[in-house]
Design a protein with these regions (language model features):
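Bacterial N-terminal signal peptides that target proteins for export
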Residues: 1-8
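N-terminal signal peptide c-region/cleavage motif recognized by signal peptidases
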Residues: 15-17
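N-terminal secretory signal peptides
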Residues: 21-77
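Soluble non-cytosolic domains of exported or imported proteins
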Residues: 25-32, 95, 132-139
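A mature extracytoplasmic/lumenal domain signature
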Residues: 49-51, 59, 71-73, 85-88, ...
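Short, internal acidic amphipathic alpha-helical interface segments
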Residues: 81-122
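A short, solvent-exposed beta-edge/loop patch
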Residues: 106-153
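Short, highly charged C-terminal tails/helix-capping segments
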Residues: 157-163
Length: 163
């Protein structure tokens, strides 16, 4: 066997892990449908490292509220949904205080859309909409999420405005 015949498989074996690593580290792409909808709605946004859309809204009384429209979708059977997130509370310890956790559970029960979830040290309102929602439907989900989350933030933090 010629030495060059052994060289090709060796080079190929060395190149494959590097190519796989490049694929793993490539940033997820932002959903073009969501981008077009947000632009049509006139919303300013930035795309984060996960490929999600980060929006900041000015609200009444000088308050502001953060929202994310997640590019990736979730599926269950024939359903495909997209999430709109809006944070409202950050805990300082390992767990939410009991009164805060109970208030979030109560709000999840009585709310019209979405539910409160724990995301690391934050309470986040997550509203799920059809992945193919219209611009108007996405707008309604965003509006609901930011207003409800801002109200909960004001309630739980005595009027602070972190998000």
């Amino acid at each position: 066997m010629r030495p060059t015949a052994l060289l090709f498989p060796l080079l190929l074996a060395l190149a494959l892990p590097a190519a796989a690593q490049e694929e793993e580290t490539a940033a997820p792409e932002a959903d073009p449908l969501v981008r077009a909808q947000l632009e049509a709605l006139g919303y300013g946004f930035e795309v984060d490292a996960d490929g999600d859309f980060k929006l900041l809204f000015d609200l009444e009384e000088g308050r502001s509220q953060l929202a994310y429209v997640i590019s990736g979708t979730e599926e269950y059977g024939a359903l495909q949904v997209r999430e709109v997130w809006s944070p409202a509370y950050r805990t300082e310890g390992d767990a939410f205080p009991v009164d805060v956790a109970n208030r979030l559970l109560q709000a999840s029960h009585t709310g019209k859309l979405g539910a409160w979830v724990r995301q690391d040290d934050m309470a986040v309102l997550v509203v799920k909409v059809a992945a193919g929602a219209t611009g108007a439907e996405l707008d309604a989900a965003i509006s609901y999420a930011i207003h409800v989350a801002d109200g909960m933030e004001a309630e739980l933090t005595n009027g602070q405005d972190e998000f």
